[in-house]
């Protein structure tokens, strides 16, 4: 059994695809349920990287956004902290990254409170699936999309995924008729 308090929200920067995998493995190696820590007792996870992507794409006002030399947007924590003068002593140092993540969350919340609160309200998978299953197009941010659109696009659900909990979506920026014959 997990001794963490109920209603805990685990917030990180690129944590869903990186840190959480280490935590799961740590639990597994020590004979604990590798998933219980983030769902039991109304616990949840929230990845600020996707919040940053969505904010940059939809509501960038009030936040300085770093750009690489080639003109492409950069959402690295250390660059966001530097350009916005947030505390971040040493990139990839655990405590420093935590402090920068907290400061960045505070900045997004201060500059774009409605978007911040909305994204926080849909942090759980069941809330996201309500949007996905609504039958309406929705805005989606993912590292799998191009930088040209700040890794954000409008998609529509095509079908439930056959093997996983989730859905297969179609990027509505592309011609649907031409792709139907593929």
Predicted regions and their residues:
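Acidic two-metal-ion nuclease catalytic site recognized across multiple nuclease folds
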Residues: 106-181
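Metal-dependent phosphoesterase core characteristic of DEDDh/y 3'-5' exonuclease domains
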Residues: 6-114, 119-122
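Short, small-residue-biased leader/transition segments that mark boundaries at the very start
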Residues: 2-4
């Amino acid at each position: 059994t997990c001794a963490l308090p109920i209603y805990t929200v685990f917030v990180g920067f690129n944590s869903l695809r990186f840190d959480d995998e280490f935590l799961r493995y740590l639990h597994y190696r020590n004979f604990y349920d590798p998933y219980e820590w983030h769902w039991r007792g109304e616990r949840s996870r929230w990845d600020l990287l996707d919040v940053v992507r969505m904010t940059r794409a939809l509501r960038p006002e009030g936040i300085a956004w770093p750009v690489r030399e080639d003109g492409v947007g950069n959402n690295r924590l250390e660059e966001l902290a530097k350009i916005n003068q947030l505390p971040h002593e040493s990139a990839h140092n655990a405590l420093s990254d935590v402090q920068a993540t907290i400061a960045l969350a505070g900045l997004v919340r201060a500059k774009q409170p409605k978007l911040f609160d909305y994204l926080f309200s849909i942090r759980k998978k069941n809330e996201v699936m309500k949007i996905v299953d609504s039958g309406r197009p929705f805005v989606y941010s993912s590292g799998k999309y191009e930088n040209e659109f700040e890794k954000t696009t409008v998609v529509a659900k095509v079908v439930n995924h056959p093997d996983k909990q989730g859905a297969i979506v179609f990027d509505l920026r592309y011609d649907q008729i031409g792709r139907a014959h593929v």
